[in-house]
């Protein structure tokens, strides 16, 4: 890490500690969990009640922004905290009713997704779940909604630099959260076509509460769409990348 980023991280640690108690209380209240804790660290926790914010994410975001640093800090921490939690439960019986012959004795959501969608379904599932959770969470706070709208507007152009599948996921997020109205015409035809089909599926989802079975079913449909338009990552390169990590 260069000296500029080291200095930024030192300041970020101080700023994070100032807002941590208030953000923790906000998360505890909205997620109805007094045991939630929020801290700064580089390693994920195995506890669902322990939310860890990676400093590199804050450094990268804050070092690039032209917006108010305190607001960007608050918005980024809330966004990352929502996406780090698993604030939902799996209704195995409901899923088995939908996918009758495929989920015998399967209880874990990651196993369910692997069976039904292969290695990439988890990314679509996560973006759908967390986009809905963020939409539910943020709509109650006009100031927070405004902060996040500014952050996403500033960074929106960066989406074009991503791979096709990552572009698809990012644009799904924006289509659900509606902080901004994403324009699709600047993307490859395959990505735009996959998104346009997926938007019809988004219209069927519940945005007042997370329905896991509904999201799993949507994920299966969206992965099929991604396959048809050939925007999923190359599986061989994906596995090689995992091994390197």
Where do the language-model regions lie?
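Short, functionally important secondary-structure microenvironments
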Residues: 1-245
